[in-house]
């Protein structure tokens, strides 16, 4: 509320005040009544903005509904899609981070020297792709190896890491061999008989190779699904 006020907007108490716009964001104490009031205002013609559309959020006890799940409830009730989102998968947040860093007396970091990092393909990684950033998907949250192998082009990261500790390591780059096999150091993967095969389903290098093999098969027209990719059980680092 303070941020909205500082930007010259006036906050009203509810839909009975006929707001011109509604901003819905993540609020863990969100109630049915609050979502209903958003719906009433949107139905009455208020422009609908949201802060982010993450459907789920990792919590200590497991995966919980995120802001996007609450937004879907309003969309279902009103039939109205938000006109814009300040959060991912839009790239504004990454652009703003670079500009904020520059406003503190530092040089503006060019996009080619920046990297978008996250555990969600449909927000963190898609935002990086939309904004022209390299991206790193980490496996410490929502995304799992199967989802990586089945990712459509707009959700594919530049790099894959087990966790943030690998930021300090040089990533091994998968290489495509003449026979169509993808090799990543000692691991290899290939597409054969309608399925991705991998030499080592316990290593990150095996996953990197398998991801490349799966993406190549999909790009060539294979209708990829879970039955066509290996099950990874990554060993301890």
Predicted regions span which residues?
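Asp-based, Mg2+/Mn2+-dependent phosphohydrolase catalytic module
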Residues: 1-237
């Amino acid at each position: 509320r303070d941020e909205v006020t500082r930007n010259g907007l006036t906050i009203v108490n509810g839909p009975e005040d006929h707001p011109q716009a509604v901003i819905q964001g993540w609020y863990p104490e969100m109630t049915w009544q609050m979502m209903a009031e958003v719906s009433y205002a949107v139905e009455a013609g208020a422009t609908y903005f949201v802060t982010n559309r993450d459907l789920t959020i990792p919590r200590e006890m497991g995966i919980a509904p995120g802001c996007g799940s609450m937004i879907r409830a309003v969309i279902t009730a009103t039939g109205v899609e938000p006109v814009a989102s300040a959060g991912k998968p839009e790239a504004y947040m990454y652009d703003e981070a670079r500009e904020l860093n520059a406003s503190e007396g530092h040089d503006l970091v060019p996009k080619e020297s920046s990297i978008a990092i996250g555990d969600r393909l449909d927000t963190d990684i898609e935002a990086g792709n939309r904004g022209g950033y390299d991206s790193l998907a980490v496996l410490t949250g929502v995304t799992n190896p199967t989802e990586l192998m089945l990712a459509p082009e707009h959700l594919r990261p530049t790099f894959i890491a087990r966790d943030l500790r690998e930021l300090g390591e040089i990533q091994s780059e998968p290489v495509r061999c003449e026979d169509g096999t993808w090799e990543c150091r000692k691991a290899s993967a290939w597409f054969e008989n309608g399925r991705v095969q991998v030499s080592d389903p316990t290593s990150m290098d095996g996953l990197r190779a398998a991801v490349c093999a799966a993406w190549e098969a999909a790009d060539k027209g294979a209708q990829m699904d879970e039955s066509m990719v290996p099950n990874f059980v990554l060993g301890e680092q």
